[in-house]
Amino acid sequence: MAFRGWRPPPPPLLLLLLWVTGQAAPVAGLGSDAELQIERRFVPDECPRTVRSGDFVRYHYVGTFPDGQKFDSSYDRDSTFNVFVGKGQLITGMDQALVGMCVNERRFVKIPPKLAYGNEGVSGVIPPNSVLHFDVLLMDIWNSEDQVQIHTYFKPPSCPRTIQVSDFVRYHYNGTFLDGTLFDSSHNRMKTYDTYVGIGWLIPGMDKGLLGMCVGEKRIITIPPFLAYGEDGDGKDIPGQASLVFDVALLDLHNPKDSISIENKVVPENCERISQSGDFLRYHYNGTLLDGTLFDSSYSRNRTFDTYIGQGYVIPGMDEGLLGVCIGEKRRIVVPPHLGYGEEGRGNIPGSAVLVFDIHVIDFHNPSDSISITSHYKPPDCSVLSKKGDYLKYHYNASLLDGTLLDSTWNLGKTYNIVLGSGQVVLGMDMGLREMCVGEKRTVIIPPHLGYGEAGVDGEVPGSAVLVFDIELLELVAGLPEGYMFIWNGEVSPNLFEEIDKDGNGEVLLEEFSEYIHAQVASGKGKLAPGFDAELIVKNMFTNQDRNGDGKVTAEEFKLKDQEAKHDEL
């Protein structure tokens, strides 16, 4: 509401209450019918202003003779009577009777003939020497010297910025006349009024009345008609010469020249790396409007918001605001609408809304990242280093970059055991355990593409999470050469088949084969690959020798590894 379109008022129209022939006679005589009588039938509790000579008023009235016969009424015309007081535009009695009235005050006025139409009357309407009774209700009052009146009844404790010329604002309002009659309300439309200030988009009084407001401030702006819709009104709901009262609550404020603003809330003391364009971030946020209204929160979904930055995956203001953050940092990012969701808005975000994001950076990485290894302790003798195929026993604590503990073997009371290079752990962990000696302690940081990827582990590891493992290697059993599951520690007997075939029937069954291999391992003559199921290894070795798959191995089928490279047995 409050569009431009006023013009200076023309000379007042003179209706019935003008004198007919010159000035009224001076006040004289005594008695109830000889003097002006005023009865104040209703006076409002609040009366910030009363009518003075020179003021312009709008009022309703009913005019009757002493016997009750009506001769005129503004209500019949469905329009107030609008006139200056004390400038000779009214009969003298009415000029005097209106002085001192409050808006919404009701007066019953008895005007003697000498202060009305005298001994001439008004032909066909008011007989000569008539006493006139007027029931008057004052609707509006203003003066040509008036300016916009501002009353602030709430101002937030913090007011970092106020409305300036050319700012764009979003506000709610109730628009009433001075008598309290509502003519318009943004609340009824459940939508703010959005406009530029000070560039002619509003009536002059509202342009002036909004200047200096803070977001969250509430003020009452009273505007005289010559700074509003003037003599003609708006042609719909606002009559001519009406003073307007706007009860305004400012929700939002920005300037088209604004960029984002950043307020650092918490910055970790140790910040080894800051985010750059192309990084992938995981962060929590609360998204609010400038007035504090929450429109979205990652916390309510119990899941971080995960995205690349600097590549257009998020609104431009967030793309910029997330650059240069540390892991664990908390900051507030204020995004003007032209760097947010623009004039259209999105979902429950209104158009032209300034957005406030309170973010907490959980982690970030770059797709080009490899693992990071920091060794905290190495024993004096650290000559035997882990390699592919070795069997390792180690303890670990697994956490996210923000310190959230995911898992711990210490809490479980047992080590984690793997064969290095066998695919038993994620690739980043496999890489991080290499070239480590027994007793060494190290921290391994694993980016998600070398960890559990975008999917994570349901209920355990978030998707796209960087993982931190604090590791202590407790035991290392050297593995076998690549491709071997069993090796001899010494010379191989030339009569190997005969030694396995104890019953000498020319064929070896699985039971005989398994018993022999385990005996060689027990005596130290042979070695099975550590970390694997021994029975499965032996069975696999036997199956490889059983060429025709009949469940037994003959001398013709039996061959050593170096005799046929494609098999991993013996």
Curated annotation (Swiss-Prot):
Residues 54-142, 166-254, 278-365, 389-477 form the PPIase FKBP-type domain. It is an enzyme of class 5 (isomerase). Gene3D superfamilies: 3.10.50.40, EF-hand (1.10.238.10). InterPro entries: EF-hand-dom_pair, EF_Hand_1_Ca_BS, EF_hand_dom, FKBP-like_isomerase, PPIase_dom_sf, PPIase_FKBP_dom. Ca(2+) 1 binds at residues 501, 503, 505, 507, 512. CDD domains: EFh (cd00051). This is Peptidyl-prolyl cis-trans isomerase FKBP9. It comes from Homo sapiens. The lineage of its organism: Eukaryota, Metazoa, Chordata, Craniata, Vertebrata.
